[in-house]
Amino acid sequence: MKNKGKKKKVWEKWLCLDIICIMLILVGFSYKKIEKTTMETENFREIYQEDNKDEAEETKEEKEGEDIEKEKKKVALTFDDGPHPVYTPQMLDVLKEKGVKATFFLLGEQVEKYPEIVKRMSEEGHLIGNHSYKHEQLSKLSSVQACTQVNRTNELIYSITGEYPEYLRPPFGDWKEHLDCEVNMIEVLWDVDTLDWSSKNKDKIIKKVVTNVEEGDIILMHDSYESTVDAVTEVIDLLQKEGYEFVTVDKLILE
């Protein structure tokens, strides 16, 4: 009977040891699982925080870029009386090199002579406006004559570019109101007159611009003189250093 009791106690001890071992194994497995989950959570948190940091930096950079864009002072370069067979292509070369878009107010009689230059203007993203057909003072013409000056030029430009011009600069800045014909165009004058047609002097043209220009100004030049082509190169560099951005007149008017 005593041996039987001893065997029972030994068996109970082994059973207890087995149970303890199983419990330890389960606890160890659970700990590893918790540790793995904790590490995965920490890794996810680090990745999430890093992604958020990158997104925040990108958002900040975008906002700073937008603020810089808003801070730029906009001005418009405009050229009258073209296209000229020699100097307008040179002017287009300068603008292309500088990455600047300008506005050209064209004479119909010049458009007829040099359609390939007008086509190039349009293809390179410049704005084309109407400057009448023969540069006559519209207010001194009859309504029919004034309408002819405008409409004939519109049709010529359309035949080359496929678009009717929306902007009109009347010669001498003198517009004839209440025309009998329908001329539904936006009149564009200027703020800074370089008088380049008078001086034909590069330095005087540059001085006229840099000493008078302000934000939102429209600058008047003529793409018919070598001195103007030379001046524009420096005018662009000088004004860009002062924080100016060159746009076409529609961008100024629409804002």
Annotated model-derived regions:
Residues 19, 81-82, 132, 197, ...:
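Generic detector of well-ordered alpha-helical packing
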Residues 1-69, 73-75, 93-102, 215-255:
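Terminal accessory/targeting
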